[in-house]
Amino acid sequence: MQIGDLSKRTGISVRMLRYYEQEGLLAPARRASGYRDYGEAEERTVRRIRLLSEAGLKLDTIRFLLPCVLTDRPDFEPCAEVLATLRHEVAGLDEKIDCLQSSRDILTGYLERLG
């Protein structure tokens, strides 16, 4: 399938799909005409990238974890350092949540004072 078709099937923009390729996350075959040819494997990869991205992971972490992701759900094959990486990411998310909660508390306090 062509990149536009993959975009429609996955909900990921053409621009982002090209970025994934540039970053080495996708490696579609090339037709004789030079057009990219995406198959079912690339579609599964894009869905896995999306899953990890929606979990709040950065691209470098996704690149590291992608070979360990078995399905479009959070199922992992035991790859080296996966636990440490996931724990680090969870700690980072906890830190962001704490920061957001503090910001929310400040804004809520302002609203209460303003009536």
Mark where each language-model region is:
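Alpha-helical residues within the helix-turn-helix
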Residues: K8, E21-Q22
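Short glycine/proline-centered loop/turn elements that form peptide/ligand docking sites
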Residues: L6, S13-M16
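Short, conserved catalytic or interaction motifs in soluble domains
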Residues: Q22, P28, E54
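Conserved beta-strand-loop-alpha-helix junction that forms the acyl-donor binding cleft
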Residues: T10-G11, G34
